[in-house]
Amino acid sequence: MKFFRVVVLATAAFACGGGGGFPDAGVPDGPVPAGTFSLDWALVDLQGAPISCDRVGGVTVTALLRNRAVQGGTTEVFSCGTGMGTTPLIPPGLYDIRFELTGVTGLVATAPEQTGIVISSGQNTPLAPVTFAINAIGGLDLLVDSLKSGGNCAAVASNGAGITAMTITLQHVLGGACEPATLMIGTTPYTIDCATPVEVGCIGKTTPITASGLPSDNYQIHIRGKQNALICYANDDQLRVPPNALSLMRTVNLAATGTAGCL
């Protein structure tokens, strides 16, 4: 029995010794170095004229990546206003990449897919320039409400606002330029003149104020409600006209100005 133990221990020592026995397991390879890609983008209207991200409410540019060797996909998101960007490190491989422009109203535009893009280890791959073509035209569909139970036009004694006349102007927020659009108040045309606002009779709270063919942009509307010669109600909301022939639908509320003599 004693002899058997010696043989076993000697055999074990031989098998595990540093100079002989079984070879050591190989050290596994490290992760493959990642790469990046870079891109730049531009926005144009349907006539090819450059437009800004703010003009169409553009917020982000998203690259949607599909690595052909992997199921599913990933996204890389950039701020629209920067006009260019470089991704964080991504696995090397052969990619197909789609592009989306997203804004405050949702998806604004897409750009043509770029396919067969090789991302190499430790390198940056510049993509072809990306162009988003956008129908930079939209509209407005508004109602105006004094929040009086009797409505905008009824006498104050009847719980109305007692408004007898109104004016409307529309200006671009950036730069303050007047937009000389022709609105429709119900079925009646109304042409905006910021220098000399045109007076019309009281606009009822269920009467639509609409416009089409407006350049998409961020605007400030100025509505004034008069009791005879006094400006007694006002609204100065900012309104973003969306692109792609969509219309902004909103009720704008009139607030009392507190002008002396108003009822």
Regions found by a protein language model. Give the residues of each.
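Intrinsically disordered, low-complexity serine/threonine-rich repeat tracts
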Residues: 16-33, 57, 71, 159-162, ...
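Structured interaction patches on ligand/partner-binding surfaces of diverse proteins
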Residues: 79-82, 102-135, 201, 225-263
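Short amphipathic, basic-aromatic surface patches that mediate peripheral association
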Residues: 40-54, 144-158
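Sec-dependent bacterial lipoprotein signal peptides
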Residues: 1-15
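Beta-strand signatures of extracellular beta-sandwich domains
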Residues: 60-64, 98, 167-171, 222
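Short, acidic Ser/Thr/Gly-rich low-complexity loop/linker segments typical of extracellular
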Residues: 68-84, 175-207
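Bacterial Sec-dependent N-terminal signal peptides
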Residues: 12-46, 122, 129-144, 244, ...
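Short Pro-Gly-centered beta-turn/loop motif in secreted/extracellular proteins
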Residues: 80-104, 199-220
